[in-house]
Amino acid sequence: MPKMKTKSAAAKRFKRTAKGGFKSGNSFTSHRFHGKTKKQRRQLRGLSMMDKSNVKRYKKMIPAK
């Protein structure tokens, strides 16, 4: 059976955690910050955990090493 290929688009956008979940960057963070409050900007920093309902789909896109 051939090896599963990693979807390169998914690999660029998501990072796998030690427990098998996924982290991703937040949307709405590239420009137009003048329309967002200080609290919104602060909460959009860093990575956020992906919802559990999507994890199964992304595990197929990014197979384990």
Curated annotation (Swiss-Prot):
Skewed-composition ranges (Basic residues): 1-18, 31-44, 55-65
Annotated region described as Disordered, given as residue ranges: 1-65
GO BP field: translation
GO molecular-function terms, A-Z: structural constituent of ribosome
One Pfam assignment: Ribosomal_L35p
Presence of the UniProt keyword Cell cycle in the record: no
Keywords for the protein's UniProt record, in alphabetical order: Ribonucleoprotein, Ribosomal protein
Keyword Amino-acid biosynthesis among UniProt keywords: no
Protein name (Swiss-Prot/TrEMBL): Large ribosomal subunit protein bL35
Organism per entry: Limosilactobacillus fermentum (strain NBRC 3956 / LMG 18251) (Lactobacillus fermentum)
Lineage of the species this protein comes from: Bacteria, Bacillati, Bacillota, Bacilli, Lactobacillales
Gene name in the database record: rpmI
